[in-house]
Amino acid sequence: MMLRIPEPEVMNDPLQVDAYAAADFSSTDQTVVERVAMLLQASAASFPDQARLLDLGCGPGNITALLAQRWPHCSVLGLDAADRMIAVADERRRAAGLPSERLRYDKALLPLQQAGQPADLIVSNSLLHHLHDPQQLWSSLIPLASPQCLVLHRDLRRPDSEASIDRLCQCHVADAPSVLQRDYRASLHASFTVEEVKAQLLLAGLGHLQVDAVEDRYLEVSGWIAGCQAGSDVSRP
């Protein structure tokens, strides 16, 4: 098993921001939104009117905006530590004509104890591997969540060899700009395994959440926050 090599926590370099803002991640972004819908359907649940949907590590706001489109009766908040990413996301919001009451972006650093209205959904995509201490994310969930909050966190998972990293880079980013190729390789080195994430969740009192390997390179954490204080192993309370 390869050892983890952390990478910088914040992507605020102008070249990185421009590259990620210009890249087409529409397929993976849409997958996150569809997974949220599937998890709701599986639990016969729905978001109430004016529910708060929270996207942690939102970057240029791709998934945040998709959440606002999919659930227009909800209030969506994207948080990121990089002010340049937030600026890009908010510029896109204004260009789309979406009011800040429905979609808002703010700069914030983990861990968080509150972000205004408690969240009925907390998602992140490719945030976990940036954190030098993963408990910065997991310790934030309960304070941010409403009494019944759905969570979905999707990230890369660390391969078991350098050869596997080479294969994934060749398969998925061979034609991408050099900055994205560099970052993708670094992110694979910095990501966690399924077993590591399970241990992190146990430490955070979130051991009832589901952790799955997905496709050839992802892992996914999903479930409902409510019930975790009692240690119940449930898909929804």
Regions found by a protein language model. Give the residues of each.
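Class I SAM-dependent methyltransferase SAM/SAH-binding core
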Residues: L54, N62-L110
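N-terminal, positively charged/glycine-rich alpha-helical extensions of SAM-dependent methyltransferases
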Residues: M1-A19
